[in-house]
Amino acid sequence: MNAVIVLCVTISAVLIHQCYSTAEATLSINGGDMCIEKTCNRSIDAAGKKVIAGCPGGCLCVFNVSDVTYPANGTCYQLATTTTNRPGAVMERER
């Protein structure tokens, strides 16, 4: 009898999860992805400082090599952004 109750609760939880998560799955964080097919590079300038160039604003340059490899080519990825309608939301996160 207990097994039947546990099974019913589990099935209900899965169905509820499916109903509430389908809207999230259809949302795209890409929008108009300005970072698609953009490449970036890492080099050292004349002063010996690391220079990363090639990605537009709002994009992150990701390299598939170690941090000490120069020069290196990477790929640009768009950073995810979030917004809130609650004025106190930022203050709560900073605490």
From Swiss-Prot:
UniProt-annotated location(s): Secreted
Principal cellular location given in the protein's record: secreted
Signal peptide as annotated in the record: 1-21
Disulfide bridge partners, by residue number: 35-59, 40-61, 55-76
Keyword annotations from UniProtKB, A to Z: Complement system impairing toxin, Disulfide bond, Secreted, Signal, Toxin
Entry keyword Secreted: yes
The keyword Endoplasmic reticulum is annotated on this UniProt entry: no
Tissue: Expressed in salivary glands.
Domain of life per record: Eukaryota
Single GO MF annotation: toxin activity
Annotated Gene Ontology cellular component terms: extracellular region
Similarity comment text for this entry: Belongs to the RaCI family.
Function in brief: Complement inhibitor. Prevents complement-mediated C5 activation by binding to C5. Binds C5 at a different binding site than the other tick complement inhibitors OmCI and CirpT1, and the drug eculizumab.
Protein name, entry field: Complement inhibitor RaCI5
The organism of origin for this protein: Rhipicephalus appendiculatus
